[in-house]
Amino acid sequence: MSFKNRNVISMKDFSRKEINYILDTAEKLEPVARGKKRSRLLDGKIIALLFFEPSTRTRLSFESAAQRLGGQVLNLGSVEASSVMKGENLADTIRVISKYADLIVLRHPLDGSARMAAEFASVPIINGGDGSLHHPTQTFLDLYTIRRESHLEGLKIAMAGDLKYGRTVHSLCHALSLYGAEITLVSPPELRMPQEIIRDLQKNNIRIRETDALEEIIGDVEVLYMTRVQRERFPDPEEYEKVKNKLKVTGDLLKNADPSLKILHPLPRVNEISPEVDSTPYACYFEQAFYGVPTRMALLALATGVIE
């Protein structure tokens, strides 16, 4: 199965078979990600990181992934120091950076920016997050985490928090529909999952439940995927203040959880998971962040064609 020169824009572009292949590749590369083995798979390859929005885990895990495989990284640094501040449009930026690198990882605030960038690039584009639409590389690491810590087939999962603006849950919903998941959506009414995503799930015969209370579902699910309420996506700060503290995972809540429950979070968290949860067997979010390295290693290696 060849992924050479393949763009990674949306989970909708990948079949279940292809997703499993990428996860299998990540598993083979995990010892390299942990520093237990060395690899020069990306020797001679240059990976450009163009991040027009703040990022810690996505950007640094891509840097780690490239360097663990012997590749070199070009980093945009800050938008303020780039020609974007002079008025250069994204299409021209992509055309030029394509001449400097073998692959581009792009994060941009505009919905659909990654798909548009792929039209102008002469090298593969990996979407590191485009507006509130997609975050496929986060989804790959989420799937990898779930597979390692629980199971994918027929998973009972609750997604909670900002389901309206949260691009991580949008991508994850589609991917899990390929595995016959049972999905519970937990959010305030103001932050409900967009109807078009719910319709897509229903077309795939996925069982969906909606509620605004974690207490109602905590004993019924195998994975709880928490997300923060994204202040930067709210046009009205007052609306953010109304909903920011509506959902929180605490030790008291978890007294009613299944003992095998795993809690995931794409991070950063604000106050939606109490620090007391961090030391419990339920907490998987820090290991989840690490799994971003082997999964992104797999995507870099496959898209550049150094692994087939």
From Swiss-Prot:
Keyword flag Transmembrane helix: no
Broadest EC class assigned to this enzyme: transferase
Quaternary structure annotation from Swiss-Prot or TrEMBL: Heterooligomer of catalytic and regulatory chains.
Record keywords: Pyrimidine biosynthesis, Transferase
Transmembrane region(s): none
Family classification: Belongs to the aspartate/ornithine carbamoyltransferase superfamily. ATCase family.
Pathway as given in its UniProt record: Pyrimidine metabolism; UMP biosynthesis via de novo pathway; (S)-dihydroorotate from bicarbonate: step 2/3
Function: Catalyzes the condensation of carbamoyl phosphate and aspartate to form carbamoyl aspartate and inorganic phosphate, the committed step in the de novo pyrimidine nucleotide biosynthesis pathway.
Pfam families xrefs: OTCace, OTCace_N
Name listed for the protein in its UniProt record: Aspartate carbamoyltransferase catalytic subunit
GO BP, sorted A to Z: 'de novo' pyrimidine nucleobase biosynthetic process; 'de novo' UMP biosynthetic process; amino acid metabolic process
A molecular function GO annotation: amino acid binding
Residues binding L-aspartate: K86, R167, R228
E.C. number(s) listed in UniProt: 2.1.3.2
Residues annotated for carbamoyl phosphate binding in this entry: R57, T58, R107, H135, Q138, L267, P268
Gene Ontology CC entries for this record: cytosol
Superkingdom: Archaea
Statement: the UniProt record of this protein carries the keyword Hydrolase: no
HAMAP family: Asp_carb_tr (MF_00001)
Reaction equations catalysed: carbamoyl phosphate + L-aspartate = N-carbamoyl-L-aspartate + phosphate + H(+)
